[in-house]
Amino acid sequence: MNTEPSSAGPEPASLQRIALSLQYDGSSFCGWQRQRNGRSVQAVLEDAIAQLDPHRPVQTFAAGRTDAGVHAAGQVVHFDCSGPIPARKWAPALNGRLPSTIRVRESVARPLDWHACYSATYRRYRYTIHNGRRPNLFLSPWSWHCYQHRLDESRMRDALSSMLGLHDFSAFMKAGSRRAHARTTVQEVLVERQGDLLRVEIQASGFLYGMVRLLMAQLVAVGEHRLSVAAFEQRWRERRRHEVKEAAPAAGLCLLRAGYAKPIFTKAGWYDSQPWFFLAESDPPTDPPSTPG
């Protein structure tokens, strides 16, 4: 990616920094980050920005680098531009050039020293599990259909709560991470059931590569009584990465939002105001009797 300033571009004083609140369906992309082989959210977004500001090389920065198949309801992205478009007009202008799988909810101006990634104080992810006996076509793109039996959300809540605070989470870091260490602060956790849907939310100062999907597979083992709460805690505290062998599917994971010292957007994320629990119904205790005739 060319990051050198264009000699034909405007003076730096004319730059404005734009922050976007972004949603996307991760199943359509190979992840956030631009890649040589594959369609990334970053590449598609940068191409759309370039159409509106063709005189300056485009480079975007995101609060979280979601992996292939992972969704976002409140991704935060920034870029610098030199054109005459007012900050608030970038959202509708980009939506007219982006595929339907990416939507910009809001666009605002930010100071040039503000950064979507480095200024963030937390990121919050949600993982959704469909814990019903029968698969649901409308939920499958957004959740993990997981049913051996009803998951014990109380045990899952106890296990997840053990992670609160600043710790080394090497056990939940995929190989290939560029981080110098595996320490991060888990600030809040939530495990909540409504009908056949379980939502698990984790808020942290930052997340390791593959962290949420690795720990979710372990958490489901706790909910299925295949792994004790104590064993779950022992695995991550003692950094037993070799015992964490599976990752939960990407479809259930969504970057809910990123937070900053002061709110920068006026509209709440879609997941905050309109959770889609209504899409699933609880399984009945038994199948209804067949009707004669």
From Swiss-Prot:
Protein name in UniProt: tRNA pseudouridine synthase A
Positions that bind substrate: 125
GO molecular function annotation: RNA binding; tRNA pseudouridine(38-40) synthase activity
Catalytic activity, EC: 5.4.99.12
Catalytic function, reaction form: uridine(38/39/40) in tRNA = pseudouridine(38/39/40) in tRNA
InterPro entries: PsdUridine_synth_cat_dom_sf, PsdUridine_synth_TruA, PsdUridine_synth_TruA_a/b_dom, PsdUridine_synth_TruA_C, TruA/RsuA/RluB/E/F_N
CDD domains for this protein: PseudoU_synth_EcTruA (cd02570)
Family the UniProt entry places it in: Belongs to the tRNA pseudouridine synthase TruA family.
Description of how the protein assembles with itself and partners: Homodimer.
Pfam family, one: PseudoU_synth_1
Described purpose of this protein according to its UniProt entry: Formation of pseudouridine at positions 38, 39 and 40 in the anticodon stem and loop of transfer RNAs.
Species annotation: Synechococcus sp. (strain CC9605)
KW Disulfide bond (keyword) present: no
UniProt keyword annotations, A-Z: Isomerase, tRNA processing
BP GO terms, sorted: tRNA pseudouridine synthesis
Active site residues of this protein: 67
Signal peptide stretch: none
UniProt keyword annotation of Ligase present: no
HAMAP family the UniProt entry points to: TruA
